[in-house]
Amino acid sequence: MVLKREDCWYKSTCTYELCANCIRYFEMKYLMEHSGLSKKRQQPISLKATQDKDAFKLLNDIRLDIVNFVNNGESLYIYSEYTGNGKTSWAIKLLLRFFDQIWAGNGFRQRGYFIHVPVFLNQAKNFEDNKARQQMLKMLSEIDLVVWDDIASTKLSDYDIQQLLTVIDQRISDGLANIYTGNLTSHNAMINSLGNRLASRIWNTSTLVEFKGKDRRAEW
């Protein structure tokens, strides 16, 4: 297989025509292929701070120090009552920045994972192979950084809450980093959707960043 420069995440600065001998390419490729991100989402979009400038500044500060954020086992909840204003895009941007900072010497180790929570919960109920299910839960309990996208969008069943609580509680107790996105804008609203224990673990252990701007997808 010929690996071309246009397939590289660093094509704007890389001078190699082919990637076959590039360690960075293969290590980044492994991180991406085991990140849960679709091909489209592996290339971050530019996010303009025309609204929510303070929130964008705080997130950019976290982005610039993302390795310490992860190493310190910190958590972040990006939320808004509106859709399409950059919550998920920012979460992915932070994940990709982490990959960019730790690829050197990483080898072939899985370090970060993106989960769209509604899809994950549906899959968790329908795993035909219990071994595969246990492997997934083990990975989520041990990996350095997990993005829990759309974690607080609808009221969850007791079963769904328990599935999330088992993993998230373990991660927080073990000092592993989490980034959550959702549309619940208060602790009480989160309790109503996720139950008291899970809501408190997320809300009380996270840096809270609220987006107040409305849908901005047309700008991007």
Where are these regions (language model features)?
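A short, basic N-terminal segment
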Residues: 1-64, 207-213, 217-220
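Walker A/P-loop nucleotide-binding motif
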Residues: 71-92
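Loop/turn-to-beta-strand initiation segments
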Residues: 111, 142-145, 174-180
